[in-house]
Amino acid sequence: MRLRRFRETPVKRELPYPYLATVIRSAIWLYDTKILMRRDFLASDDHVLVQIVDTALADVTHRSGEWLVCRPGCTQCCIGAFPINQLDAMRLRRGLAELESTAPARAEGVRARARDAIARLSAEFPGDPVSGLLDEGDEASRRFSDFANDEPCPALDPATGNCELYESRPMTCRVFGPPVRSEDGLGVCELCFHGATDKEIAACEMKPDPDDLESTLLEKVEKFTGTRGNTIVAFCLAS
C-alpha cells in the first residue's frame, strides 16, 4: 500500500497583536524615560550653574553696597533684544512651563508678548525667522547691533515692571549690573557705580563662572536637542 505524501505548508507564525502592542508601548516608555532622565540631568546640572552664578552675584552685591542700584522695577536692562544660547533657551522654556502650572494666565501673557514681538521683528531679524536662530559672522553681528534696541523683553510684565521668569532668566541678565570682564575690558551698568573710582570698580569685579561650567553644559544641551546657535528670548517663549 502506497502512502500518499502531502506537501507541508509552512505555517506563518505571528506574535499575537496584544503582545506586540505591549512590546511597542514598553519600547516607547523606555525611550521617553531616557529622554526625561537626560533632561532632568541637564536641568540638575544647570541648577548647579545657577547656584554658582547667584552666589557670585550675592557676594558682589555685598561688596558693592550702594553703588549697585539694581532693584525690582528697574527695567533698563530688560529693553533691547540680546542673543541667548540654547542653555538659556532651555532654562527659559522650563521656567515658562513651571509658570504655566501655577499661573496659566500669566504664562499666556508671556507667550502673547513673545508672539507679538516676533510679528514685529521677523522682517528685519538677522537670522532665520522660522527657527529663530541668529546668523553668525561679522556682518550678522553688525546687523544685530542695530536690531530691536527698543524692544521690551516678553518676560517683562509691563504692569508691574517685574520679570515673570526671574528665577529662569538667562546668564546675561544674571550678570548685568556689577562689573564683569569681557573681551572689551571691565564693563558695568551705566546706572551703577556713580562716583566710584576705577580702582573701586575693579575691587567689585564679579567672576560669575570661574570654571566655565556654562560651556560644558551648553555643549551637552546642543547635543541633546540637536539645535546649535544663538537666538533671542521671544523665539523660545512664543509657543
Regions found by a protein language model. Give the residues of each.
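N-terminal amphipathic/basic-hydrophobic helices that include classical n-h-c signal peptides
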Residues: 1-36
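Short loop/turn segments that flank or connect secondary-structure elements
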Residues: 28-76, 80-239
